Design a protein with these regions (language model features):
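N-terminal loops that bind phosphate or other acidic moieties
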Residues: 1-120, 124-343
Length: 343
């Protein structure tokens, strides 16, 4: 079930036991792929579609969203340079470009946006963001006051550096179709691009080693070095957009969840981000997920309640994973838990 469906099921469960209680639903994404869709469900926006250069240099239609006040644009690099835009047998990271990302950014600035929030998951590229830089240079924006006056925030959930054995080429390029030899060449290209950038005085050698610069085939590096972007965890950006801190001020309990909760939950996933905000606000936080693996005890140590919505349901996994089953089990779990509340 989707985040929205999980919220709806939880609300039904609460009201079946506590009909007078107010439930505020906030369907949440971690800010990766799907960022724009999630933002559009949270705040009023207007979609904008433009033709840009795709990852393999063919024209593609890229859609992003502009807040109705015209101030902020929300976009995903995958809309212009994503892996899903390239057939599996046509994936060539040695040729793939982020040029279209630069065109999207330029279009948003030309539309008058003063802030751009961009998710950089799902890339087909490994050009270090060089294509994006070229696009902005070609339209005269790269060194302009307009781009200097634009705040760019990047939803980035990987901490890889630009190059090296833990960098963009070695870690991510094989997933994009690169051979072992191409991985080595791509890494050399990224080093060369960083060196050229340093010679221009735009970055220092330390910049390429910063966490997140290797994201999206090194696009994180170009955004940081050339556009002075701020790299933030995707969930933190989404929580801010949702006005989460103010929303939970009057809450008695906050409930979050995911398909399966385990040690990876505490590595920047939605539930982890929600938990951290709740701890700051001194609010009880429940974790209700489809499955729980807490052998290390990290979940029970950080959440006030940790529970699988499928506890007591012995039906086979394929049935438990069906949307209707999951929603009913969410309703029942929440309803039963609310029997013990005094609110």
């Amino acid at each position: 079930m989707s985040a929205e469906e999980a919220c709806n099921a939880a609300a039904i469960g609460v009201h079946s036991t506590l009909p007078g209680v107010e439930v505020v639903a906030l369907p949440m994404s971690d800010g990766g792929e799907g960022l724009v869709e999630c933002v559009r469900k949270m705040i009023p926006t207007t979609p904008r579609s433009i033709m840009v250069v795709g990852p393999m240099s063919k024209k593609v239609e890229a859609t992003y969203a502009i807040a109705t006040d015209g101030y902020t644009a929300y976009m995903e690099m995958a809309a212009a340079s994503g892996l899903t835009l390239v057939a599996e047998n046509e994936r060539k990271p040695m040729m793939a470009t982020t040029y279209g990302v630069g065109e999207m950014i330029a279009d948003a600035i030309q539309q008058g946006c003063k802030k751009i929030v961009i998710g950089i998951g799902g890339s087909a590229t490994c050009d270090g963001g060089k294509g994006m830089v070229e696009a902005l240079r070609n339209c005269g924006l790269l060194s302009s006051d307009a781009i200097k006056d634009t705040k760019i925030v990047v939803a980035c959930d990987v901490d890889n550096p630009l190059y090296g054995k833990n960098g963009a080429a070695y870690i991510f390029a094989p997933q994009k179709g690169a051979t072992k030899e191409e991985v080595e060449l791509l890494d050399k290209r990224l080093r060369s691009f960083a060196h050229d950038t340093e010679l221009l005085g735009i970055a220092t050698p330390a910049t390429a080693l910063l966490p997140g610069t290797g994201a999206a085939g090194g696009l994180g590096y170009a955004l940081l070095a050339y556009l002075k972007a701020e790299l933030k965890a995707g969930i933190e950006i989404m929580l801010d957009i949702a006005n989460f801190d103010n929303t939970i001020m009057d809450a008695d309990i906050v409930v979050t969840g995911e398909g399966k909760s385990d040690h990876q939950t505490m590595m920047g996933k939605v539930a982890h981000g929600v938990m951290k905000r709740c701890r700051k606000a001194n609010k009880p936080i429940w974790l209700l997920s489809g499955a729980i693996d807490d052998e290390e005890g990290m979940l029970s140590k950080n959440f006030d309640l940790v529970k699988s919505i499928n506890d007591g349901d012995s039906r086979p996994l394929p049935i438990l994973m069906q949307k209707e089953t999951a929603m009913k089990n969410m309703e029942k779990t929440i309803s039963d838990l609310c029997l013990h509340l005094n609110i």
